[in-house]
Amino acid sequence: DDQTGLASGGNKTRKLEYLLAQALAEGADTLLTVGAPQSNHCRQTAAAAAKTGLRCVLVLGGNAPRLEGGNLLLDRLLGAEILWAGEQDRLALLAEAAQAQAAAGHRPHIIPYGGSSPVGAAGYAVACQELLAQAAAAGWRVDHMAVASSSGGTQAGLAVGAWAAGFAGQIHGISIDRRADDYQPALAELATQTAGLLGAPHTFRPEEMIVHDAYLGGGYGVLGEAER
């Protein structure tokens, strides 16, 4: 998925394929989303907006840096408007920004954090079946899948796709910012909602969501001794 071609690729493209279809079907002209200053999700959302002729507003945590580089620079080059949350709650500011866009005559559509809604997660339910089909065609035996996991859409989507395909193996989520006992209920709920959206109702239980939280370290994006 790093070769998808949307502003250097990344896993969010599969989610955005469905999220953008939803936004366009609703007649939106402006996308808004939220993330960290160097968010890959925000960079890909800005690229998807530019590709489809939509405006883009990004709500980023913290304060503007003295110099902009990396994904933040790409966000600017892709035409995104950037709002810095500072000490404010990012999600509250996101809602306020959407209201301001509507008041200005635009038709805003909020893309959730990480693209992780049932619509976004559907992209990875499909991806799981694609992966399993490719593995079977290549003669590979797959009984474990491991992914980085944060907002939950990738892992929840894979869980739905695996269940629908009758995959007997396990989906492992390596948490980047949440303890397992706090995260598993949210994952199970998202997977359950995604299965319902896809017309294959199934209730996922928190204990079915395998989350490894031993690698959290000092937090998201914090380089510690273990990483050195």
PLM region descriptions:
Residues 1-228:
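PLP-dependent amino-acid enzyme catalytic core
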